[in-house]
Amino acid sequence: SCEVEIDSFYDDDNNGAGYYNRSADLCSRTWVSFYRDMDGNYCRQELDFFLDRTGIDYIRVEYPNGAVDQYEYNFRWSWENYAQTSIRMSYGPNDVSYLDDVYIGGNRLSGYLDGRNNFVEFQGKR
């Protein structure tokens, strides 16, 4: 018989002595980014990661006429690799985002969101 074990990504955080467990750092604060969307609207995004592998993605869009839209999305997250440099964020069926080349340090979270042409950087807000 052939048995296949389905790995739970790299979520037990028991990475051995060779790697520093980055989950505590990731979950230690709210991560905030300010940017302009494709239409030039001013946007604020906040990401919260929790140790139970859930998270909240909050986006506020301010329009030139003064109107404001706010969106809140829940997601489940996991580390995609042993070195904890890639985060998988699942918002629902067929709705998954990846943050690659993750850097956490100096009150910053940065990486490439869903592709090499989309570098993002968040500042920590305690």
Which stretches of residues belong to each language-model region?
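Lipid interaction determinants
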Residues: 3-74, 83-126
